[in-house]
Regions:
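Polyanion/phosphate-binding surface patch
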Residues: 17, 48-77, 101
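Short, conserved secondary-structure transition motifs
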Residues: 158-171
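Intrinsically disordered, low-complexity segments enriched in serine/proline and basic residues
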Residues: 8-17
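Intrinsic disorder/low-complexity segments
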Residues: 2-4, 8
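Positively charged, Gly/Ser-enriched RNA/tRNA-binding surfaces
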Residues: 5, 18, 25-45, 53-55, ...
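Short low-complexity, flexible loop/linker segments enriched in glycine and/or proline
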Residues: 61-67, 170-172, 266-267
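Acidic, His- and aromatic-enriched active-site or binding-groove loops in soluble protein domains
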Residues: 67-73, 173-195
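Short glycine-rich phosphate-binding loop at a beta-alpha junction
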Residues: 155-160, 250
Length: 306
């Protein structure tokens, strides 16, 4: 997704979003887009169109994550940061619609130096989510379009937001954003210091982070003492992914980025031949009564601007 997986921030394993090395042909992007669109349309997805700019009527929306500008007439506009948020907003305004859509276009964010960065996204969303088959079809489109165009060796990390939510439910909300940032960095000593500094019990969180290094095999699921329904979902997802030649599946329940927006299984795709983060997504909450599922392929600006 991203949709809502902010995978263009810091990245697991030190990987950057997908890009090309010097001298590699941009024909691969063309092949990727064609393959993605063909796969999406063959599965019944329809094109979703949305402007890159939106009138900023509520000034309380302005924060460090919002890229905005003032037009000549004085009005404030914000640039699209995330497609999934736009699709969720559309669905909530039109709740009778069933959305099975694909999209392509640019999103904008600030980097660590305060400069605006562009990322091209190819993604798809299903709202409402009805069954694990919805997750499978999203993954099918992502995996097959990537294997047909970019690489023949993928690592897919599978997690579940409910696992880490259970570990942090006792942590005061004022500490959670920073805590999840530390979990993403997987620095055990930094987490221990944070726990000591703020008098927090983070032993379950630390176990998850440590397990992300030592217990990544799907055969070790029993060691996590998961709720049976969660374990069953993960097993079904792993079984589905394992049928693809060239795909390696590992478990990482410490995947914490935007955990507050997810509600269930999550996934990240990495290229193993030319290490890079390629795609991410998962199941998320649309409103109090509705879930959705989606996934997004990321292509950074340096890929096409050379």
């Amino acid at each position: 997704m991203v949709g809502i997986w902010k995978a263009t921030g810091s990245h697991p394993k030190g990987c950057d979003p997908f890009s090309f090395k010097e001298g590699k042909s941009l024909k691969r992007i063309d092949k990727l887009v064609r393959s993605f669109v063909n796969e999406a349309m063959s599965e019944g997805f329809e094109l979703f169109l949305s402007p890159e700019t939106e009138v900023l009527r509520d000034l309380s929306q302005i924060n460090d994550d919002v890229v905005f500008f003032q037009a000549k007439g004085g009005g404030l506009f914000k640039l699209r940061r995330d497609y999934t948020a736009t699709i969720v907003e559309f669905y909530n305004k039109n709740p009778s619609d069933t959305l099975r859509v694909w999209y392509s276009g640019f999103v904008y964010r600030y980097d660590q130096t305060g400069q605006i960065q562009n990322t091209f996204q190819l993604g798809l969303e299903i709202v409402p989510y009805n069954s694990p088959q919805d997750s499978f079809v999203v993954l099918k489109v992502l995996i097959e379009s990537v294997l047909n165009s970019l690489t023949d060796k993928l690592l897919i990390e599978v997690g579940d937001s409910r696992v880490i939510e259970r570990c942090i439910q006792h942590v005061p909300k004022k500490f959670r954003k920073k805590l999840l940032e530390l979990v993403d960095r997987k620095d055990v000593s930094e987490l221990e210091f944070f726990a000591s500094l703020n008098n927090l019990d983070l032993k379950d969180v630390l176990k998850l982070v440590e397990a992300s290094f030592t217990k990544r095999s799907v055969n070790q699921l029993k060691e996590f003492e998961l709720d049976p329904s969660i374990e069953r979902e993960i097993v079904e997802l792993v079984e589905f992914l394992s049928k693809y030649p060239g795909v390696t599946v590992e478990i990482d329940f410490s995947l914490a980025r935007t955990v507050e927006e997810y509600d269930g299984p999550t996934f990240i795709l990495f290229d193993l031949k030319d290490p890079a983060l390629i795609a991410a997504g998962g199941r998320y909450r649309v409103n109090e009564n509705t879930l959705g599922v989606g996934g997004t392929i990321f292509v950074e600006e340096r890929t096409w601007s050379r």
